[in-house]
Regions:
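Asp-based phosphoryl-transfer active-site loop
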Residues: 4-13
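Substrate-recognition "cap/lid" segment bordering the active-site pocket of phosphatases
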Residues: 21-43, 54-77, 241-243
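GNAT-family acyltransferases
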Residues: 41, 122-240
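A short acidic, often aromatic-flanked loop/helix-cap motif at beta-alpha or helix-coil junctions
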Residues: 56, 65, 108-109, 123-128
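Conserved acidic residues
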Residues: 77-79, 116
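Short acidic-hydrophobic, aromatic-tinged amphipathic segments that line or gate anion-handling sites
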Residues: 117-121
Length: 245
């Protein structure tokens, strides 16, 4: 499911006269409206596709995350800001708003410190990317793959209880490395892993959930092994869910 509900684009030249503002708006306004139209069209296509293939129905896992989001965010829920003014970007960040900076020839000297994402050509953006940017700001795991029975998504700290149960079976760790015995160390490792793998490489080892129940049933993904150029693909399925096709 999509958590991004609204995209707001602001173009604002710093210290410009009224005439300069009009020229500025004319120069960048067309690109802004083109993006908004594209986002609207792409979102409609996604909703239609989900309804057609039956994936539009919320699974247990998706509903749980949505309910958590609704209780944690208020008026700014689901909104991403795209701005080209450094001061405005800082104001929004201080308010806890997700921000993407639009960089162009007229704002090269402005300060966008703290903004986690930026683009030079907004016409290259699409809804899927903006959804991912929004999720990064509000700490919602990216969904990697959805099948009829499973949801593959980024791992979060709430998964650890279930993962410890899965890895407690000796057959699971026979050919793969287990978790840290100390919960605190595993949480610290997951935090570093999220920042250094998910945020930087946009891939890694993910969590597999049963769509019907939301139960964590295993892990799958890619690992970078020392001495090898290409990532290694691997998976772990909890014993109760093995041999089910």
């Amino acid at each position: 499911m999509d958590f991004l509900k609204q995209v707001s684009i602001e173009i604002y030249p710093e210290g410009a006269s009224d005439e300069e503002r009009k020229s500025y708006s004319k120069k960048y306004g067309a690109q802004m409206h083109t993006l908004l139209d594209a986002i609207r069209r792409q979102r409609q296509e996604r909703e239609f596709s989900q309804q057609r293939n039956g994936s539009g129905k919320e699974c247990f896992e998706e509903k749980s995350v949505r309910d958590s989001m609704m209780s944690g965010y208020e008026s700014g829920q689901g909104k991403l800001w795209i701005v080209d003014n450094g001061i405005r970007a800082q104001e929004l960040l201080e308010q806890g708003c997700p921000v993407l900076a639009w960089l162009h020839e007229d704002n090269r000297n402005q300060d966008f410190s703290g903004v986690r994402y930026a683009c030079k050509n907004i016409n290259e953006l699409d809804f899927d990317y903006l959804e991912k940017v929004y999720r990064r700001y509000v700490d919602i795991p990216w969904e990697i793959l959805t099948t009829k029975r499973c949801l593959v998504r980024e791992t979060c700290v709430e998964d650890l209880d279930a993962l410890y149960e899965i890895y407690a079976d000796p057959s699971v760790t026979k050919y793969t490395e287990g978790l840290y015995p100390e919960r605190a160390k595993e949480e610290a490792y997951l935090k570093d892993y999220t920042e250094n793998m998910y945020y930087f490489y946009n891939y890694g080892v993910w969590t597999i959930c049963d769509r019907a129940t939301g139960q964590v049933i295993g892990r799958a993904g890619f690992s970078n092994r020392e001495g090898y150029e290409d990532p290694e693909l691997g998976f772990v399925i909890g014993v109760p869910w093995q041999r089910q096709g």
